[in-house]
């Protein structure tokens, strides 16, 4: 059975301006107008935006076509992503404007103008051409977060190749799987890069991956960027250094069909091999550019985006590489973890470059909060207008901290919902064009124009207000939606996303709609706890726990129980100033029972840190494996291995308690 849902510490906050508040009614009516237009005339709605924001070699013959099950956009149009991101800015004042600003944990800094980026993209494109890469070939990119990684992506797009970026934290098996599936002709990598005081050897990992494939390896060449100038093994005839072949020569951009694939980005499935999500060229560029202006709020020429994501994820594709450069903005990137070498490194970067939008993950915000307020107060963060979070559910406590401490009560907190598959935000707010009243915690806001998102019950009917249901999206899907899956005839696509509700896209998330129309995404449906016939999302319990004033972070798992079905265990990280104790554990437990009812009474385990991926997602499967005494599986993406020791220690203490009780 599903529970009726009352959110913890729910608030509807004003926009912070009396003048804007007086316009609130108009703002919501304008939002309703945009939604109505995008629903009744989707071709006209998206077509006008594509014409206004992008440069096309040839106009499309058909704006939209609904197929089974995806929507095709701008059919017959000719375009090039690299030209739109770089070349078209060189005949005006953006030529010498900063396109990318980069820092490393070693203190290195680099400002890359649009003119510089044009030069670098052509160098990389020329290098790829010299290695035999052409239109339709796949190029795997395994690079740290540097301007060179961005240039390599744009160079692939320039010559019509399809890039497949792999996050630099992945291990050799993940690389081997993706390279083999994509049949990559060339792998672009770096010798090594610094991460939390250590040297991460990328070329060595690529060698291990290709060696494991043996004769199955499709790779003809490995192109190596000398990031740290370390000694690496170079296989004769296959491996080549970028500085030896990356000579500047103008490369004419390939005229691509709007529905030619721009990239493949692999996302892990719950079972089986990773899914190669394919995005088109014209549609993807249109949708991401629109949401950069509207949802990320970079609507002004001099706006600056500091994004803590990575090019190995969809956020880094959409809101580091493509849309900021498509729209001629400045994006700031930091190669290492945003809290290294000191906790307020991220705040220092915001202050130094006067970022106007700060993009980060919900998990990272919780992590920053753990260090306390003083680190933030040491910096002038007044340039920030908008804080954008995505990834995991944003609980109330970090939402409030971001608004009041980081933003001084004057920023717009825009928690978005979207996926690798959808390419750009689908739920959220529109701070770039209108201010809408914010709701706290995991409220993702409203369906964004052109995105027809609903919450349905098990039978496919609209869920009642505050009753949890399933998040779905109706066609026509926005242009930034995936075009399909690599190496798939459509069967896996339909089975994965369209088997539960027919023609409706089902991403696998729980959600609810409140009485005001706000949609709250409650977490993955496959992370459900089954307690005495009740199905409760792990994210719901985590939200209740983190609403306790002492808690910075929490991860919840279920362990089989012969009586209740599952017993809830919570691993809790405390804020500075609080110490673990049995009394505090009981107080947190009582708080959760009060918020969620007596049916939910989690066992509390205190830890100093939670195991997370380098993208900031909590590795709940790893925690559960330790609890169950089973193998933790692949740990190559873990951010801090010491977090595993924390979990093991907590489990051992639990076992001792059980023996003595």
Curated annotation (Swiss-Prot):
Catalytic activity: 3-hydroxypropanoate + ATP + CoA = 3-hydroxypropanoyl-CoA + AMP + diphosphate
Thermal dependence of activity, per record: Stable for 15 minutes at up to 80 degrees Celsius.
Residues passing through the membrane, by range: none
InterPro entries reported for this sequence: Ac_CoA_lig, ACAS_N, AMP-bd_C, AMP-bd_C_sf, AMP-binding_CS, AMP-dep_synth/lig_dom, ANL_N_sf
Domain of life: Archaea
GO BP term (any one): acetyl-CoA biosynthetic process from acetate
Keyword ATP-binding: yes
The UniProt record lists the keyword Acetylation: yes
Alphabetic keyword roster: Acetylation, ATP-binding, Ligase, Nucleotide-binding
PROSITE patterns: AMP_BINDING
Induction, as annotated: By autotrophic growth conditions.
Positions of post-translational N6-acetyllysine modification: 617
Homology family: Belongs to the ATP-dependent AMP-binding enzyme family.
Subunit architecture: Homotetramer.
Protein name per UniProt: 3-hydroxypropionyl-coenzyme A synthetase
